[in-house]
């Protein structure tokens, strides 16, 4: 346990449709610390790209909203997912499932507009080939959907500049434990995918 964040627990539980279950969750709040308890229910679906493409057969253009989530990147987070460690990212690639689906959409002849939601830079080199347009939306907040729609429908010209450098791949910015900046980052790089201020 940490004074900043408790260890997250994940319990898998099989439930049958129509049955009632009594679930009890117990927790203890320490003096002078706030308790933060969340309870999520869901299930994982197998990915069937062809079934998705079949549903989109009459669509010329697909707006794909993807990226990563603030549940994956942050500080001192108990994340045990490939590509992430303690809230830090060990690689900067787009998750493989999304990358593969964007490629499948392009191969199916779709025009693809990718709205990328992330709190930091993502290596989007393959997406510059599989997507016809990329809109960086960051984590947009409650009015974000309307703001993105206004851009997509031409009511507003996206005029922002990138506050960070987007690298081509993880090799340009590998996971490191030595925080010396000499020879690293955008200050020493001439071939970033999207440089600072793009």
Protein language model regions, located:
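C-terminal non-catalytic regions of proteins with extracellular/luminal or membrane-system context
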Residues: 1-198
